[in-house]
Every structure is written in C-alpha cells, then in structure tokens.
C-alpha cells in the first residue's frame, strides 16, 4: 500500500480528558466507538469516569447532509438505470447513451450545488454559511473533474471537436468575466472561430480546417509586424494574444482564474486542432507557466493533469484520497467501466477496482439509518462479493416496526437469501411470543417455513388451553388452512380444535374417531394423551355407544402405554402425592369407563341388526 | 400523458394524504401532507401545489410542490388523517407480557376518522375508539386479533372493517357490547397477510383489499366469506389501495415493487379500449377472475362486482415513468394524485383523467 501523504489529523473527543490518555475503541463497519476508560493500578478507589458516554466517530459526514441525500437518491436511480440498459447498449448508439448518462449525473451534481448555494446565502450563522460554501466548492470541483473525464474518456472527442468541448468546459466553470478583454478572450473570438469551424461532423476535414486556420494566423502575424495596431497598445496586445503569444496571455493572469483556463485559451489561439494525445504536453507547460514557481499544484490540479495524461487509474486514486466520500469515485468508475476503459487487473483483495469502490460506497450507505435501501441495489451489481456483503449487512438492520421488517424480508426473498429470511422471521416471531401475540408469531413462522418455531407456538397454545381450559385466539386456530401442515404440532392443534368443534356440534361419532386417530397416528404429544383420554370420558359415558369395540381396545392400549411408561418418582413430596392421587383416580375412572363401554359395544355389535 | 412532477425531498415518505376540500366546493386539491419514516427524526410536512409556478403555453400550471411547514414526529409516521383535534393520545397501543406489569409500546399501524370519531389499530391487535373532544378512549377492544392489524376503514358509521396479517377481514360493530367481530371473511388457502383496505365511496358493501403477494381482492361483505374477484396485480406487497372518491370506477394501487397502477373499470368509453396511446404508458387488458359469485342484487351493480367477463374489461395503466424503490403511499382527490416513495421522492400529477 502507498504511504500516507501527510500527517493524520487529530480529532478531539469532547468531554474526554485527552491528557489522561485513557481511551478504548473498537471498529465498526463504517465508524469507530470510543469511550473513556480508567485503568488505575495505584488507587483502588472507584472513580467515576469523567465522561460517561460512548462516542461514535464517523469519517463520512456527507451521508447525513440533507441536500446531499438528494444526490445519493437521484444518482442511485441513474446507476440502476445504467446497469439495466447495459445489455441494450450496442453499436453506435452506445456512446451517445453513455454520454447521456454522464450528463445526467452531472446535472444532478449541479442541482445539488445550486441548492446548497442557496442555503449558503440564506444561512444566518457565518460558520454554517462557510461550511455550505466549502461544500459547494467541493461539488463544483467534482463536476469539473467529471466533465473533463466525460470529454476525454466517454465522448472521446477527436482533434477538432475536442477543443470545442474544452471551451464549453472552461466556460461552464469560469464565472467572472467582466472585462472587455476578458470578454474577448472568453466569448467573442470563439464565436468568430465557431463560424469559422462550423459544427463538428460536417464535411470539412481536419486538414481543411487547419489550412484555413493557418491562413488566418499568418494574416494576424502580418498585421502585427506591419504595425497596424501600433497606435493602440491594447489592440496590439490583443493581436499578440490572438497569435497565441504566451507572454501576452500571462499578462492577463488575473482574468484567467486558473491554469486550465490558460491552457484552453492558449490552445485556442496556437493549436486549435490539437490531438488528444498531445494534450498533456500543453497541460503540463500551462500549469508550470501559470504557477510560475510561486505555488505548488493542489490536489485538484494533479487530478486534472492525470486526466489530461489519460491515466484513469491515477485520476481515480487521487480522487479517492482527496474526497471524503466514495460517492464520486464509485459512480465515475462504474461509468468508465461500462465504457470498457478499465483494465481488469485485480487488486489485493480479489475484486476489481469498480467492485471495490462500489462495495465501499454501499457499505457506507448501510451505516446510515435510512439510506441502507439504496445500498442494496449497489450490492446487487457487484458480481463477486456483493451477495455475501449484502447477506452480512441486511441481518444487522434494526427492525423497529413490522413494516420495516416486511421490506427487509422482501429484499431477502427476492434474492433467495433463505438463511436471512429464516433468522429475521425467527427474531420477529420470538418478539411476538414474548408480547403474547401468538397469531403474529405463527404467521412469521409460516412465512419462514420454520417448522420448529411453529411447534413452539403450538405448544404455547396447548399450554394455554391446559391452564385455562379454553382456547385463546380461536380466530387463528379455526382458520389455519393448509399452513396446518407446517409442523406436526400445529396439525395436532388444528385437529384438536376440530374435535372440540365436532363435539360442540354434537357429531359425536366423528369426534370420537378423530380423537382416536389423534392418538394412534402419533401426532399428539405424549404429554397430552392424558388430556385426550380425559376428553374421551364424556363420550364413553354417553347413553348411546359411540366408541366401537375395536376403538375401545385401541383406547385401552393407549392408556396402558401411558401408564406403563410412567417413570418411578424419587422422593415424593406433598404436591406430588396429591398429583399422583389425582392421576390414579383419573386412570381408575378411565379404566372403569372403558370396560363398561367395551361391554356395551360388544353386546351391541354382537346383536342382530335392528335390535 | 399526464404530467407528473417528481421532487426529491431527503426523507423516505411513508404516507401522503390530500387535505380534504369542503364538500360541494369547486376547488381542486392544493395542499397535501406527508409523513416520513426511518429517520432519526421523522417529520410530518405540509406541501402546497398552489399557483407557485407560471402559466405555460397550454395554460397549465408549472412548478413543483413547495414545503409549507413541518413538525417533528416521534417514531415512524404510519398513517395520516385530517381532523381538527386538540388532544394527543400517547400509549394508545402497547404490549403487555404475561406475568409482568411493564408495558412496551407497540406500533399503531392505522388510523381512520369520521368526524368526530377516530379509530386506531395497532400491532398489539387492539382497536381503540376515540372522540375528538374526549381525553380517554371511548371504547377499547383488547386482543381483538391475535395477529397484527394492518389497516382499518369505516363501513357504515358504527361499523368498521379491519384487515390483519393472517389474511382475515373482520367487521366490528360498536353498537354491540362484546369483544367479538360480527363477521369474519377470509380467503381459504394460504393465509396471505392483507395490508390495505378501502371501501367503495357509494356502495358500502364493496371493499377492496391488497395483500402481501400483491393480489387485489374485491369483496362483497353481504355475500359469503369469500372475495368476489381476485386480481393478480403487483409482484410484491401492495401498500395502499384507493377507490377514487368521485369516480369510483377508478381504483389506484401502489406497491413495494415500485409501481403505481390505475385500474379503470368504467365500461362506457369505447376509445379507452384502443391500444394506441401516447408513449410512456403501458396498458394491459384484463378480465375479471370470478370466484364464488352468489346472486347479486341486480338493481345495484357495481362495475367491480359485475359478472360478465366479455363486457367488463379493466384497463390498467402504470403511472410512474421509471421503476423506482417502493411506492409506499398514494392519495387521490379530484384530478390530482400524489404518491411518495422510498427513493425519497414525491410525485404529483394534476391531470389524472386527461
């Protein structure tokens, strides 16, 4: 990795006594947790920490800016649109479409800039106003760089139109032109030139244009030498400028705000048919001449220079270092990747540069309480590590309402992330059970197809029934539908409730066979058999014979199964003895009822029909 | 095509509602309210689409919506209604765990007003009835539902209808004393949660619901327990369904899949069946899929309940120009429609029926 270019900045944590130098920290996905500690070996007494709070330190504050949020949202729409039309981008229209996308991005940046500028003017607090203004200049620089990249890398303007694009570029970014000379430099002559050039794509070839320009240049030179303008020094220097005389141009340094304005003006008058590959020579010399050894190039200058040198990787690298947020480099790199300009050399961690930048950007979005939804789409378009990153991030989104949970689940289901669906549904189902919302808990386990949890919820219902003697939430149990098949316990619950319903409707024979099948088919849990057998008692005691002999035998077998399997108790205590007593009484009653029923059933079945 | 204005507002919009215009007035809607969600500080904002712009050459109004004012809101904004109140009811919805005395607050998921009564439902399965001038709830039905109640609407004044997350519609009559619903309707089969409900403005027995699978169902609450029509609509949860208040043959739905659909069941205009429309609109024809149609009282036939498939075609139009993140909410009033999305944008159109 490269070495840092400068000293790391020191950030003071408010409230923490930094002279004591006792802090602990831990890294998070996009931030750091810091708090004050006090490890004091000498004194044993308890000291109250000077600062009893934990601080979250974030490097990226842009995500929290209200105005920049619009940038993130709008550019997300453009990004997703670009990925979607990728397959349709073929042939000649491809370049035009990509240029259109680039212009869309730039217009979004400009809109943000405008709004922030308005806010900066309207701000009452000067510190706030300064902050907004600096934000405006950062956005302006971003747009400047993007525009240049669009001209050089996406539009790939050839010699000829190249200069026109560069002229537009400079004009867009140079605001102060209030002097006649500056007017001439900025607007009048290019207009003359434009009529001279006509629009690109015409029948004039580059050589024709060059000849014409050469002719005009010679004429200017002749005028200068003849001394036509000797009477007016202004006109004379104007003529020199038009001849591309660098010294004359540099005299007007105050009007040319920066070296790239100087560069383009110089090219306009001396090398209007400059080829793209020659640009960097002129750029470097313009920069040197303009700075004149007084100041050193700023980061922005280096970035622009790298662009003129067609070193895309250097541009991206410098931008990454200079800007505090990954937004710019992520989107620009993605667009350049669509132009097939990035070599696919792999970085250290196995993914290419575009993917790395998108992952970083998207992770930053996930650290935001609200913009995480945008991050999902960015992860989708990272073929290697996107899915895995999404899986890790999406489980950690705090779910405060069901509505939010539903959205997160929908995202997971659309991408077949069954593990995450399961774990989220389980969390929500547990919360519901704790809040005694058994219906909700059941619907969450149905959504996750989680049989184990459905069993848990059913057990709760059955326990409630045993305690209270009646079912709660009948609206749910009565209407389970095919979801009943999710787990055996749930099926049992549904069928048991059906038994009660049949009993209530006095359809005793159906109720009886249902009850029996519940036990013989083994879906009833062992612990519940006693309850089921006790439910059978009233059926056995009815005047008419309900259980057939066969069924009675079955019931007796079940009872024996139950009683024989009972473990021997250890130390009996009073409660246990009482329970045992109740149990024994029940068993005896059952045995008696079963025997009586058997007798009646045998007699009934043995008799002739009709008797 | 209708002009639809989009504006990015730096907050995810969970609800939008037009401010009601006085009945019988010729004014069109010009103010709407929005609520945000998922922010550390949520806001309820009022926006105006009044004459801020200039008249363009067609005589239409230009300019997008402007913020009038906003206030902070604690928690996500789940539902909005307009009424004049002087009260605030906190802790209307809460969870209690068995055996413990503490209460945790539960999200309130829906609210509906019919001056002066206000009904709220929540994730705790509770229904509350408030009056605008009373401090305490007039009536509370605890544990009305074992699952989450997602939405509520008035059927007739003493009756409300709720939908829940196990796919049931329940009708509650406040004149009755018990805590049981007077009627339960549901679709057999998969218990798909229902998220939204709206009643036909003129025919109080016709109700439309939208579910988690994006299915639109039309119900007749007098007839049986099954829906009259099931229409496969969206690919993801349908968040809101609205009948147009003055043109009830038109229905609007919006969904998590990022689309907003206009369902036109009016059968009178033959040119509507033409396939030649201006660009940007995709029109699909769909026949009703009928299930379980009992004998409908013939004198009052709503186009939504009609049985003749050959005669009744519904034209469906998608109103948003590009696919976006989830459209969470929409509202229609007269020729105006407003909707809000998770992409932090609000869309407004003033020429719905152009």
Question: Could you say what each language-model-derived stretch is?
Answer:
Chain B
Residues 114-192:
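Solenoidal tandem-repeat scaffolds enriched in leucines and small polar residues
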Residues 180-244:
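Eukaryotic tandem repeat interaction scaffolds
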Residues 5-7, 69-71, 99-103, 139-143, ...:
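Short C-terminal beta-strands that terminate individual repeats in beta-propeller domains
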Residues 11-21, 75-82, 102-114, 146-155, ...:
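Canonical WD40 repeat/beta-propeller blade segments in eukaryotic WD-repeat proteins
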Residues 50, 132-135, 174-177, 221-224, ...:
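Short loop/turn segments that connect beta-strands within beta-propeller blades
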Residues 1-78, 88, 237-238, 245-251, ...:
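Terminal intrinsically disordered, low-complexity extensions flanking WD-repeat/beta-propeller proteins
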Residues 39-44, 96-98, 109, 124-128, ...:
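Short coil/turn segments within WD40 beta-propeller repeats
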């Amino acid at each position: 990795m490269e070495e840092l270019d400068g000293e790391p900045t020191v950030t003071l944590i408010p409230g923490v006594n930094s002279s004591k130098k006792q802090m602990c920290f831990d890294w998070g996905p996009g931030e750091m947790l810091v708090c004050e500690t006090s490890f004091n070996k000498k004194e044993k007494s308890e000291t109250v920490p000077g600062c009893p709070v934990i601080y979250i330190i974030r490097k990226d504050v842009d995500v929290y800016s209200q105005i920049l949020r619009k940038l993130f949202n709008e550019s997300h729409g453009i990004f997703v649109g670009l990925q979607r039309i990728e397959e349709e981008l073929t042939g000649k229209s491809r370049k035009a479409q990509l240029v259109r996308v680039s212009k869309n991005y730039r217009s979004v940046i400009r809109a943000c800039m405008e709004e922030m500028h308005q806010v900066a003017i309207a701000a009452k607090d000067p510190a706030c106003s300064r902050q907004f203004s600096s934000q405006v200049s950062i956005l302006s620089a971003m747009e400047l760089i993007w525009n240049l990249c669009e001209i050089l890398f996406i539009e790939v303007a050839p010699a000829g139109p190249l200069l026109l694009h560069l002229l537009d570029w400079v004009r867009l970014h140079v605001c102060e032109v209030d002097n006649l000379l500056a007017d001439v430099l900025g607007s009048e002559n290019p207009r003359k030139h434009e009529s001279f050039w006509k629009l690109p794509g015409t029948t004039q070839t580059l050589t024709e244009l060059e000849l014409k320009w050469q002719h005009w240049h010679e004429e200017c030179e002749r005028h200068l030498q003849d001394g036509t303008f000797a009477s007016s020094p202004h006109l004379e220097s104007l003529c020199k400028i038009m001849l591309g005389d660098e010294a004359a141009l540099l005299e007007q340094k105050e009007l040319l705000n920066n070296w790239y304005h100087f560069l383009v003006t110089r090219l306009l008058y001396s090398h209007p048919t400059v080829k793209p590959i020659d640009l960097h020579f002129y750029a470097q010399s313009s920069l040197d001449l303009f700075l004149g050894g007084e100041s050193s190039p700023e980061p922005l200058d280096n970035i622009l220079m790298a662009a003129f040198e067609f070193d895309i990787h250097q541009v991206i690298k410098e931008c990454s270092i200079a800007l505090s947020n990954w937004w710019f480099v992520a989107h620009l790199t993605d667009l350049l990747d669509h132009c097939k300009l990035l070599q696919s050399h792999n970085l250290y961690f196995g993914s290419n540069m575009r993917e790395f930048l998108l992952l970083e950007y998207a992770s930053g979005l996930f650290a935001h309480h609200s913009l995480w939804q945008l991050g999902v789409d960015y992860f989708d378009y990272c073929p290697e590590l996107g899915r895995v990153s999404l899986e890790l991030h999406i489980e950690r989104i705090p779910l405060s309402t069901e509505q939010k949970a539903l959205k997160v689940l929908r995202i997971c289901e659309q991408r077949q992330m069954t593990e995450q669906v399961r774990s989220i549904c389980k969390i929500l189902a547990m919360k519901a059970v704790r809040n005694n919302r058994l219906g909700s808990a059941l619907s969450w386990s149905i959504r996750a197809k989680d049989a184990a949890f459905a069993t848990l919820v059913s057990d709760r219902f059955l326990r409630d029934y045993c305690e209270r003697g009646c079912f709660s939430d009948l609206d749910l149990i009565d209407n389970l539908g095919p979801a009943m098949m999710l787990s055996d316990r749930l099926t049992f619950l549904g069928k048991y409730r059906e038994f009660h319903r049949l009993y209530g409707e006095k359809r005793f024979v159906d109720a009886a066979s249902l009850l029996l099948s519940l036990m013989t088919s083994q879906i009833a849990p062992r612990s519940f058999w006693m309850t089921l057998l006790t439910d059978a008692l009233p059926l056995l005691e009815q005047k008419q014979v309900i259980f057939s002999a066969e069924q009675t035998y079955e019931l007796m077998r079940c009872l024996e199964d139950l009683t024989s399997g009972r473990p021997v108790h250890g130390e009996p205590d009073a409660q246990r003895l009482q329970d045992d007593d109740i149990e024994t009484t029940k068993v005896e009653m059952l045995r008696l009822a079963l025997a009586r029923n058997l007798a009646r059933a045998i007699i009934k079945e043995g008799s002739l029909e009709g008797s | 095509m209708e002009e639809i204005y989009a504006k990015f507002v730096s907050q995810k919009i969970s609800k939008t509602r037009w401010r009601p215009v006085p009945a019988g007035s010729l004014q069109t809607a010009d103010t709407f309210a929005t609520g945000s969600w998922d922010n550390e500080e949520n806001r309820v904002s009022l926006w105006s689409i009044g004459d801020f712009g200039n008249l363009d050459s067609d005589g239409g109004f230009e300019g997008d919506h402007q913020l009038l004012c906003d206030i902070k809101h604690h928690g996500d904004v789940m539902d909005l209604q307009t009424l004049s109140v002087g009260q605030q009811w906190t802790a209307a919805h809460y969870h209690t765990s068995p055996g413990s005395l503490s209460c945790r607050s539960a999200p309130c998921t829906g609210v509906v007003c019919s001056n002066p009564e206000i009904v709220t439902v929540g994730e705790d399965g509770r229904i509350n009835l408030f009056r605008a001038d009373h401090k305490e709830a007039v009536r509370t039905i605890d544990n009305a539902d074992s699952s989450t109640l997602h939405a509520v609407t008035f059927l007739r004044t003493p009756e409300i209808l709720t939908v829940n997350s196990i796919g049931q519609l329940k009708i509650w009559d406040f004149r009755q004393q018990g805590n049981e619903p007077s009627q339960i309707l549901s679709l057999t089969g998969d218990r798909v949660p229902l998220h939204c409900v709206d009643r036909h403005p003129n025919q109080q027995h016709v109700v439309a619901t939208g579910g988690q699978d994006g299915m639109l169902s039309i119900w007749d609450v007098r007839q049986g327990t099954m829906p009259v029509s099931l229409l496969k609509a969206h690919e993801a949860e349908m968040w809101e369904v609205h009948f147009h208040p003055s043109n009830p043959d038109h229905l609007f739905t919006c969904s998590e899949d990022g689309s907003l659909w206009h369902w036109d069941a009016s059968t009178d205009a033959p040119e509507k069946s033409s396939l030649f429309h201006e660009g940007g609109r995709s029109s699909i024809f769909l026949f009703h899929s009928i299930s379980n149609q009992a004998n409908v009282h013939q004198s009052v036939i709503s186009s939504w309940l009609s049985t003749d498939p050959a005669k009744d075609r519904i034209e469906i139009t998608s109103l948003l120009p590009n696919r976006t993140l989830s459209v969470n909410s929409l509202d229609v009033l007269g020729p105006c429609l407003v909707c809000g999305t998770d992409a932090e944008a609000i869309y407004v159109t003033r020429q719905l029926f152009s």
